[in-house]
Regions:
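Extended acidic/polar, glycine-enriched regions
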Residues: 1-51
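Short, low-complexity, polar/charged sequence segments that are solvent-exposed and flexible
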Residues: 27-28, 76-79, 117-121
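Helix N-terminus capping/helix-initiation residues
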Residues: 26-27, 65, 134, 140
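A common structural microfeature
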Residues: 3-5, 54-57, 95
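Metzincin-family zinc-dependent endopeptidase catalytic domain
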Residues: 90-168
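Aromatic-enriched hydrophobic runs in primary sequence
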Residues: 6-13, 21-23, 72, 84, ...
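Fold-level signature of zinc-dependent metallopeptidase catalytic domains
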Residues: 32-85, 100-112, 142-145, 150-151, ...
């Protein structure tokens, strides 16, 4: 593995470079944490013909136990089809790569603080954000991005094992 140069350029509305920076990354740097590539298995649900020019969407399991991964995959497929049932996604379906990340929790469901229910799930999600009963979020973003470490993604959809509608 060789050192690589990362260049970032910021453009204005006229496509002129306003600012730029370069950074070199040595893969053997002691501050780069090695991860277990098999920590969270994933399944490609839809593969576009041109993977270099597609939008990568990752469905991430939250509150599904290892025994419930079949249910998670079914829920992911159902959510994927629901997205593609609507314009403009219907006609652009071949531009999307969809992956389901099987991040198993030890317990099923999600926390509901207003009901006194706190669960230790893989992403630590919970309802009642900002005291809104349907507002579901997680503060454990590092865990979320660690679960996605070996999966290319542009957009993240966390599927929570609950029948209650929520989002955040």
């Amino acid at each position: 593995k060789q050192t690589v140069k990362i260049s970032v350029e910021l453009f204005d509305y006229h496509s002129h470079v306003m600012a730029s920076m370069q950074h070199y990354v040595n893969p053997s740097d002691v501050l780069i944490r090695r991860i277990d590539k098999s920590a969270h298995p994933h399944l490609v649900l839809q593969q576009p013909a041109d993977t270099a020019h597609c939008i990568n969407i990752a469905f991430v399991a939250e509150g599904y136990t290892a025994c419930q991964m079949g249910k998670f995959l079914d829920d992911s497929r159902r959510a994927m089809e629901a997205i593609f049932d609507h314009k403009p996604f219907t006609s652009l379906r071949d531009k999307f790569r969809i992956v389901a990340v099987e991040s198993a929790s030890d317990v099923d469901g999600t926390s509901e603080p207003s009901a006194g229910k706190w669960l230790d799930t893989v992403l630590g999600s919970h309802f009642d954000t900002f005291y809104s009963t349907r507002y579901l979020t997680t503060l454990r973003l590092k865990r979320l991005h660690d679960a996605l470490a070996c999966v290319p993604y542009d957009h993240i959809i966390v599927l929570v094992n609950t029948s209650r509608y929520g989002g955040g």
